[in-house]
Amino acid sequence: MRWSKWFNVFCIVALGSIYGYKLFTNQEVSTTRLIIASVIVLWNIVGLFSKESVKQAQQAN
């Protein structure tokens, strides 16, 4: 796995766990920050499954 994939996985796990914990413990979450975090998580998920990464992985093999 390339470093960019690890970065994407780290961002997804970190933001997901932080906001998941806040939501499950009924802490106040700013709507703006939640939207920004959701966009970042979705962007990282797209980065994990993008076609460019598949091509790079095939070239590496």
From Swiss-Prot:
Keywords: Cell membrane, Membrane, Transmembrane, Transmembrane helix. It comes from the Bacteria. It is a multi-pass membrane protein. One of its GO terms (cellular component) is plasma membrane. The chain crosses the membrane at residues 7-24, 29-48. It is found in: Cell membrane. This is Uncharacterized membrane protein YdzN.
